Amino acid sequence: ILQRLLGGDRCKARVLVISPTRELAEQTHKAFEMLGKAAGYRSMSVFGGVSTKSQIKTLKTRLPEILVACPGRLLDLMGQRVVDLSGIEILVLDEADQMFDMGFLPSIKKIIASLPREHQTLLFSATLPQEIRALAKQFQRDPVRIEIGASRPAETVSHFISPVSQGDKYEALRTVLGGIEEGQTLIFTRTKHRAKKLALQLTNAGFNSTSLQGNLSQGQRE
């Protein structure tokens, strides 16, 4: 994508990446920022959960060549007429199946409808449900489908299952954590409430623990 940008216009958005979450948007933005630094290309991430004022100021000062955005905030800024997408040459729909699951498909169609007729669309998706195939058929001409084999767990990762009752889960987890000598541990829970409660329990038990869940503000996430 960066190679395609060489020799073209500056100070206008030429690449638009649509991401389902703010974390993925920020991660993608930082990757573009690092890779495009030598060529002088600017990247910007746009997502909700933070004030629009700083985003609008940046967009009005100098529009970055690469714009990484979540659908909701991008539509908001488009409605305020502070985003010019008339120069977009490449559109990337990242984690398209996840965006469909989150209900973003109508928003994505609105965004695509505002883009120039001549642009390339790249669609990245772990799965290809009917809705995503229909989207590709509607907005892509003569698409090339590239499939990558399923990733395998690292050989250094061990797997085991411990059947325990609900009431014994915490003590079983403490036993497992107590056997880990160093490094970080990532624990997945079913709900946001459970993540917050478990992090507090582990902190009280002497572990350096924190929760990462949907109720956190952007500042807390960072």
Give the ranges of each region predicted by the language model:
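Conserved helicase RecA-like core
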Residues: I1-E222
